[in-house]
Amino acid sequence: MALNDFHVSEPYTLGIELEMQVINPPGYDLSQDSSTLIDAVKPQLTAGEIKHDITESMLEMATGVCRDIDQAAAQLSAMQHVILQAASEHHLGICGGGTHPFQKWQRQEVCDNERYQRTLENFGYLIQQATVFGQHVHVGCANGDDAIYLLHGLSHFVPHFIALSAASPYMQGSDTRFACARLNIFSAFPDNGPMPWVSNWQEFAGLFRRLSYTTMIDSIKDLHWDIRPSPAFGTVEVRVMDTPLTLDHAINMAGLIQATAHWLLTERPFKPQEQDYLLYKFNRFQACRYGLEGVLTDAYTGDRRRLADDTLRLLDNVTPSARKLGADSAIDALRLQVKKGGNEAQYMREFIADGGSLIGLVQKHCEIWAGQ
């Protein structure tokens, strides 16, 4: 199967996708009513898109192409308002978080959608288990070779993005001991983790052609790598973040990725090599397991450093780019988060340690998303 040509897009433009939980009070389990909400809100949208994801308990908010984080925030805020209004009318709740803390995957209904039904046929129960919730950020690129360079550059910071956004410590009613348990769900998929090594767009087209021989890959959307090029949009898409509990944090994460992309493509601080990925999964695991307390290991020198310290270094490196893009408020907020030493997974555990229940935790998440 041939790959679409890489669509030229304005560099550093943004697109944000948020996979939201549809909740059924008063038990605060996942609902199976996303279709009802989507039908209710679609006529009210003036920008962006609200659509299905894999199962009926998931609802995806997606911006259009945005110049900066302020425009993205305005679009997401407008969508948030109409979704919350419709959810209230249908006695449902909406919240973020990378996993629902006590839902049972066996109860999840795959959407009546040709692509998702085909995916269910290919992957069986793994698709129902993939009822987890992430944030994806698209960044515009001028051409395919820039996209491949950017993908490799951003891959250096996958642990940083995971640790900052980690919001999935609970699954199936248990504390997983992970800050981000969501990504573990995808470990059984054949396309889990980093994209196989290529050095340019021509090589990527050849890789895609060979992957399509498996009959499991019809389009780029069927590849679930941590970061992937999206030729139809002319973007690189970062897919490792948990859906945050607040819109503000989602915007901050998008601002960081936009600023990092600008820094990478203007400064070209790395010469990508296949060996860069030698310890990729080990460092990724550290971020998932321990969050900002994880330890990174350099694939070339063996040097080890705290993820929190390296994240502060990244924030310093991208600050000039953030100023040029109007994303400096995002970098300031994330720097404060790192210095305080926390993420949303830590907040969730503190809520439970203070005597809260998992039901109460989901209720609190719905209140947070609604701004209460």
Swiss-Prot record:
InterPro entries in UniProt: GCL_type2/YbdK_subfam (IPR050141), GCS2 (IPR006336), Gln_synth/guanido_kin_cat_dom (IPR014746), YbdK (IPR011793)
EC number(s) reported in the record: 6.3.2.2
Catalysed reaction equations from the record: L-cysteine + L-glutamate + ATP = gamma-L-glutamyl-L-cysteine + ADP + phosphate + H(+)
Molecular function terms from GO: ATP binding; glutamate-cysteine ligase activity
Keyword Glycosyltransferase: no
Any single GO BP term: modified amino acid biosynthetic process
Name the record gives this protein: Putative glutamate--cysteine ligase 2
UniProt source species: Salmonella heidelberg (strain SL476)
Gene it is expressed from: ybdK
